[in-house]
Amino acid sequence: MIKRLALFGAAALTLTACAPDAAAPAVQAPGAVAEELLLPLPDATTPAITAADLAIRIKTLADDTFEGRGPGTPAGEASAAWIAAEMARLGAAPGGDNGTYFQEVKMVNQTVDPATSELVVTWPDGEDLSLGFKSQAVYWTKRQNAGQVSFAPGDVVFVGYGVVAPEFGWNDYAGQDYTGKTVVILVNDPGFATGDASLFKGNAMTYYGRWTYKFEEAARQGAAAALVVHETDAAAYGWDVVTGSWTGAQSDLVRADGGASRAALEGWITRETAEQMFAKAGLDFTAQKAAANARGFAPVLMEGLKARGTVNQTIEPLSSRNVVAVIPGATTPDEYVLYTAHWDHLGMKTGEKTGREGEDFYEDDIFNGAVDNATGTAALLEIAEAMKAETLDRSALFVAVTLEESGLLGSAYYAENPTVPLNRIVAGINMDGALPIGLTRDMVVVGYGASQLEDRLKDVLATQGRSIKADPTPQAGYFYRSDHISFAKKGVPMLYADGGEDKVDGGVAAGKAAAAAYTAERYHKPMDEYSDDWDLTGFEQDIQTLFQVGRDIAKSADWPTWYAGNEFEAARKESLGGQ
């Protein structure tokens, strides 16, 4: 694990007025950060974007002291304070609530007690199967106003992909009333399963394929419980990611209705469990899955099966924070170029054996999130420092959002409660999860083919002898799995560019191998740790590239647009008054 950095005295760490270097004037109260920092700010960094400066910031943000940057926790919120203090040190002005660097995000943590909770399926012969928590199922409730949430025995219905998409002529829920019933749902969408380009978007996952949508739609249909069947290829991650991500404290925004509109129970079940349930109902899982891929699929009652459940939970109202900073433009300061990255990760899961025996990380309970997303947050700070050294026409807006790991909640909150009008944000760039694999010949654009920002990226890459590459795994739905989507839904043109895949040392095969190894061994696990042997040369070049794209827009009068026909084009036109 990373060694904890030595703590300074409290007096040295309290920022009532920051003391930045000579190149960055002090940011005065009320925008100052009046909190004690758990870890010191860097002694000196430079406006040049360098691997050395990135390493300092990544290492600090991924340090054990911040305990995995869990939103609402003292250590997690201390990491947000550190980011704000670093923005102040760099000379960026506060852009949050009441002249501060913070936008408060009211949240609630809900923690299931597996020992007293249950999810029970009754077979046709009357025998009960209580699904093993983590071995067969992981479940929770989004209802926030009760320590115990139950649903009575009810029918179980297979609803295919659980999609209602009029634009695709698709309705998996047609013809039934789902009140009091448990729905069983496939992950992803029919386009992925079949590879048929005429279904949805073919191999590229749509939002209808996301687990978030599945549970939202089940609630709209009035279901008592919603169970998504986990399959590694379709989900793009293994069952260990499910057990690591959806157990322990689960965060949500405070909802006006206390979550009453959601199903009583939401969860994942293993494919093996699903196969057992289908067999008991006299159905073949593989055959039913194939049927769900065809237009005109009708939901299937799983004859003789009943499901009931009880979730006992602790509920803890908390508050987290988005960190917001701005570097004002000189000519049109009311127009903004946005950079985003999420600062949060999964926090601590005390007492869990999350590694493999013999590894240093065995029984480590801190999910440090070095790649995910200390890298993106470090890049946000690095670009802010570089922008401060420039004379910009437009303002540069930096938002480090919370609660990404809980379903993009911090960015969704900001998009609903923006600190600047969203129709004054000219364009945005999101940074999330860069792998330290060295120099590459390309950069991957997630959701490629979306906006004119890609043309600008392509031009910058050409000056480096590099190229742009479409997402090699569109079936994983990464375009809908990071914070740019919250702004895109509001019409803001967004670019989400990851590091490249074609390594200078080793080619595409080496790049694919590195990505696969990270997903298998480190993603959403305590093993996502910083190491001093990371090769950040490629990350340095990528962040220089994203800085240049944003800087050039901030020094121009151009308004990049979505490509014609893009799903977010209409929202942008509406926000701009039909322009």
Question: What does each model-found stretch correspond to?
Answer:
Residues A22-D97, P328, Y563, Q579:
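N-terminal hydrophobic or amphipathic helices/low-complexity stretches enriched
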Residues T122-D125, K134-G175, G259-G369, E382-E385:
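Soluble metallo-hydrolase cores and metallopeptidase-like ectodomains found primarily
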Residues V159-D240, D334:
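A conserved hydrophobic secondary-structure block that centers on an alpha-helix together
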Residues N203, A234, G347-L453, A564:
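Acidic/histidine-rich catalytic neighborhood of metal-dependent amide-processing enzymes
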